[in-house]
Swiss-Prot record:
It catalyses: tRNA(Val) + L-valine + ATP = L-valyl-tRNA(Val) + AMP + diphosphate. One of its GO terms (molecular function) is ATP binding. It is an enzyme of class 6 (ligase). SUPFAM superfamilies: Anticodon-binding domain of a subclass of class I aminoacyl-tRNA synthetases (SSF47323), Nucleotidylyl transferase (SSF52374), ValRS/IleRS/LeuRS editing domain (SSF50677). Catalyzes the attachment of valine to tRNA(Val). As ValRS can inadvertently accommodate and process structurally similar amino acids such as threonine, to avoid such errors, it has a 'posttransfer' editing activity that hydrolyzes mischarged Thr-tRNA(Val) in a tRNA-dependent manner. CDD domains: Anticodon_Ia_Val (cd07962). ATP binds at residue 602. Belongs to the class-I aminoacyl-tRNA synthetase family. ValS type 2 subfamily. Its EC number is 6.1.1.9. This is Valine--tRNA ligase. It comes from Bifidobacterium longum (strain NCC 2705).
Length: 911
């Protein structure tokens, strides 16, 4: 296709006998791969590149239609930008490390890690595949850490092939030569390099501190990974006693923590307890002496208004412990059970006996024992009363989190540094959020941070911290003086690799070294996706050129639910490392809801596998459903929308074939023979054709503005609305003239009028192929191949500009087409109400409309009469606004004043 001085030259191929959407995916996907249609060239400067930080989907089994939904939004923008002339950098990654992957591997192969076991090079898992069923830990075969990691790598490789096949079928215009795995060597090198630089600048640090702990997954959990869920429990009214035996009552939902109590806390303004501040009481059962203290965070209207502070029952306990410098009395282990040894602070013999009964028990079992003992001692006032409380859960867990003291790695994120917090708020203000109301979620999250980002995890399949520690003469690790590798050694696994100056024989012995065994949280790697895909800080020239042309990136598309995790953490990392935003724009997709308007998720079991609708309706139809939804808003899984999308794709094929076939008969009267065409806007001379071009110019302008603002659904709505009007009204109105068909009186349209119609049809359908290309890549590529053989893909063609359509319109109003369409609609209505064939002639008719409507209809009267088979008198009556108001007729409507039908055509005899 060439477009010089607004003339569009077309090379028309022979048209297929039958058209349809089935089979288009396989046909065009092969061509795109062979031609490198979506390959990133990287031959131009930064301004000519559009780079996308594509979300790497979590490799933990299967995708659902929610993924198809959000990734389609991104692909629409990628395709649009490519057609706008940008060299689009659109990579794909796989988030294949972390807890979701580990859990899938455990269930899929029926295994679990036992770090004490040696590596078995001949290990074969007991089975493969469990149809998503959870395998109990007691039934899982213990294997070494290395064997487990090998199984993780094997299964994720299988899953990634399936994911890629789905994305390709959906038509994502990914450059598949630009892929990465978050557990791969390059991402590991980036993650470790960034961490070492954070460490050198004092932004990463380790600390022994109380933190949230998931007893199921046996790992620490960050604030961003929390979910607050309603959890049933019981309030227990329990007596602490003064020296003289006088009781003071607290109410608690966790009596099993009585042995961990350090104090009683009340609000300093609570008149009920002011007299007791500074005094001491004894805990029930254990007889441990604890002070009564004041703290403003104590809630006067909650329970008894006075609470016990234990180490640790919840985050409030941590706050009180820290502010009031209370002792640490931990009794819960990392496995969620009570410690085996009776603590030294319990000195009372009877108290030590009670504790011994709870040792090694789960918190649930210990609670039952303690409540029974409180009844026996008389320290339980009444029976427990049921309650529901909001409790912290790990977002992927099913048990309430405990708070356990452990050594962990943290990264500064503004949670403890007011200056950094303010800087990250400012970064959020620099970022263009789409939709903009999502910005407040970012700001609320940053303002509400109460601690730095915990980035270490006590798991196995992840990026290792590139650290060792010296081991002193007593065999204890010196955590205050970590040993770091040089960057040119990265990536390293400290459990396998040896620090410089040491050898393997010195591992885990006095005077030697020991490895950091924790791994990085998966978000600690995912937060660096902009640096990973753009090859930040890599020494080779190709990587330097890639980084220069793609970073900072242009777009981060993602779900609204991970603003606090992925979006914020990526902003934090880029701010610390690159002193800038990682991208200029962020688009936030909503959730997909099931028919009951509940969020689709694998954990709820209400997901739809995307292969099903793609196979049934076609990729274009599924993309249409996804693209019709606005950013930031939830949408339902709607088969009806997919059917509309399929109908739209089929209509594009049929309408284009119909219009391109006009006037293309070879000597054997075969319709649609190969031909060349030049669609010159100057050849559009008829009023109706010019009106169609005027409307097209308006649509191109509105769609372009919407897509520039990342409003893909608004652009689709504008394009689709006019496409149907173009097909249902314009093509129907001009097809007789385009064919050169004589009217009912034998008058043949002029050559000029015929050319005007054919040119407008060509210009229009060429434009629609390009306008719909980001949404319906397969159907548009098919029709483009009929129009522009040999010119390459529609997805490398230029996005339409208004110039040729403005030139063709020469000042015409698009309203002329609207009025003409309404007039034809009334002519059809006359026949449908009379229950006669649409081919029935109208002997005479009078239509009324507002004066501007009459003027517009008159300008296209010949086309309207021929489309409606008006063979006789055709009168137009102008109505003033007052008349329309009196009759209750809208000023924008056309009405039938009088009509007379002729004889319906004779029915053809059946053979």
């Amino acid at each position: 296709m060439t477009e010089g001085k607004s003339i569009i030259n077309a090379n028309l191929t022979p048209l297929p006998d039958k058209v349809g959407v089935d089979g288009l995916e396989d046909k065009w996907r092969t061509v795109w791969d062979e031609d490198g249609t979506y390959k990133f060239r990287n031959t131009r400067d930064r301004k000519a590149v559009y780079s996308i930080d594509t979300p790497p989907p979590t490799v933990s089994g299967s995708l659902h239609v929610g993924h198809v939904f959000s990734y389609t939004h991104t692909d629409v923008i990628a395709r649009y930008k490519r057609m706008r002339g940008y060299d689009v950098f659109y990579p794909m990654g796989w988030d294949d490390n972390g807890l979701p992957t580990e859990r899938r591997v455990q269930n899929y192969y029926g295994v679990r890690v036992d770090v004490s076991l040696p590596y078995d090079p001949d290990f074969k898992p007991p089975f493969e595949g469990t149809d998503g069923k959870k395998i109990d830990a007691k039934d899982q075969v213990p294997i070494s850490r290395k064997n487990f990691i090998e199984l993780c790598e094997r299964l994720t490789a299988q899953d990634e092939k399936l994911f890629e096949a789905l994305w390709r079928k959906l038509g994502l215009s990914i450059d598949w030569s630009q892929t990465y795995h978050t557990i791969g060597q390059h991402p590991q090198r980036v993650a470790q390099k960034a961490f070492l630089r954070n460490l050198a600048r004092g932004e990463a640090y380790q600390q022994d501190a109380p933190g949230l702990w998931d007893v199921t997954f046996q790992t620490a959990v960050a604030q961003a990974e929390l979910e607050s869920r309603e959890y049933p429990g019981f309030y227990h009214k329990v007596a602490f006693r003064f020296e003289d035996g006088t009781p003071i009552y607290i109410e608690t939902t966790r009596p099993e923590l009585l042995a961990a109590c350090t104090s009683l806390i009340a609000n300093p303004n609570d008149e009920r307890y002011k007299q007791y501040f500074g005094q001491y009481v004894y805990s029930p059962l254990f007889k441990v002496k604890v002070p009564i203290l004041a703290h403003p965070a104590a809630e006067m209207d909650k329970g008894a208004g006075i609470a016990m502070c234990c180490t640790f029952g919840d985050v409030t306990d941590v706050e009180w412990w820290r502010d009031l410098k209370l002792p640490t009395r931990p009794i819960i282990q990392r496995n969620g059970r009570i410690v085996m040894d009776t603590p030294d602070w319990i000195e009372d013999p009877a108290g030590r006996e009670v504790f011994a009964e709870t040792a090694g028990k789960t918190t649930f079992s210990a609670r039952k024992i303690i409540v029974d003992k409180l009844r026996e001692s008389g320290d339980l006032d009444g029976e427990p009363t049921p309650t529901k409380r909001m409790t912290n859960f790990y977002e992927k867990g099913d048990k309430p989190l405990e708070i356990v003291t452990s050594r962990q790695w943290y990264l500064k994120n503004g949670g403890t540094d007011a200056k950094l917090n303010a800087e990250l708020i400012e970064r959020g203000k620099e970022l263009e959020f789409h939709p903009d109301f999502m910005r407040v979620r970012y700001e609320n999250w940053v303002h509400g941070l109460n601690g730095d980002w915990l980035i270490s995890r006590q798991r196995f399949f992840g990026v290792p911290f590139p650290l060792w520690y010296p081991v002193n003469a007593s065999g204890e690790p010196d955590y205050d003086h970590p040993i770091t590798p040089s960057e040119d050694r990265l990536p390293i696994d400290p459990t396998i690799d040896v620090p410089e100056g040491y050898d393997e024989s010195q591992r885990d012995v006095p005077g030697g070294f020991t490895a950091e065994k924790d791994i990085m949280d998966t978000w600690a790697t995912s937060s660096l996706t902009p640096q990973i895909v753009t090859h930040w800080a890599e020494p080779d020239e190709a990587s330097k050129a890639l980084f220069a042309s793609t970073f900072p990136m242009d777009l981060r598309p993602q779900g609204q639910d991970i603003i606090r995790t992925w979006l914020f953490s990526t902003v934090d990392r880029a701010h610390l490392e690159n002193k800038c935003l990682p991208w200029a724009h962020a688009t936030l997709s909503g959730w997909i809801l099931d028919p009951d308007h509940k969020k689709m998720s694998k954990s709820k079991g209400n997901v739809v596998v995307p292969n099903e609708p793609i196979e049934k309706f076609g990729a274009d139809a599924v993309r249409y459903w996804a693209a019709a939804a606005r950013l930031g808003l939830d949408a339902t899984y709607d088969i009806g929308q997919m059917k509309i999308g399929r109908r739209l794709a089929i209509k594009l094929l049929n309408a284009t074939k119909f219009a391109l076939a006009i006037g293309r008969e070879d000597e054997n009267h075969h319709v649609g023979a190969a031909a060349e065409a030049a669609w010159n806007p100057a050849d559009v001379t008829e009023p109706l054709d010019r009106a169609a071009m005027a409307k097209l110019a308006l649509v191109v302008r509105q769609a372009t503005e919407a897509l520039e603002s990342y409003e893909h659904s608004k652009a689709l709505e504008v394009i689709e609305s006019y496409f149907w009007q173009f097909c249902d009204d314009y093509i129907e109105l001009v097809k007789n003239r385009a064919y050169g068909t004589p009217d009912e009186h034998g008058n043949v349209p002029s050559e000029k009028a015929v050319k005007s119609a054919r040119t407008a049809l060509g210009l229009g359908l060429d434009a629609f192929a390009r306008l719909l290309a980001p949404y319906l890549p397969y159907a548009t590529e098919e029709v483009w191949s009929w129009m522009h053989a040999g010119s390459g893909s529609v997805h490398r063609a230029a996005w339409p500009v208004v110039d040729p359509y403005v030139e063709a319109a020469t000042g015409a109003s698009p309203e002329l087409l609207t009025w003409a369409g309404k007039a034809v609609e009334q002519l059809r209505k006359i026949k449908s109400e009379a229950k006669v064939s649409m081919k029935t002639p109208i002997l005479s008719v009078a239509l009324s409309a507002a004066s501007e409507g009459v003027e517009a209809i008159h300008a296209a009267l010949g086309d309207i009469a021929q489309a409606g088979r008006v063979v006789g008198k055709f009168d137009l009556v102008a109505k003033h606004a007052e008349e329309s108001a009196a009759e209750g007729t809208p000023e924008t409507e056309v009405a039938v004043e009088a009509s007379e039908l002729g004889e319906p055509p004779a029915k053809k005899p059946k053979h």
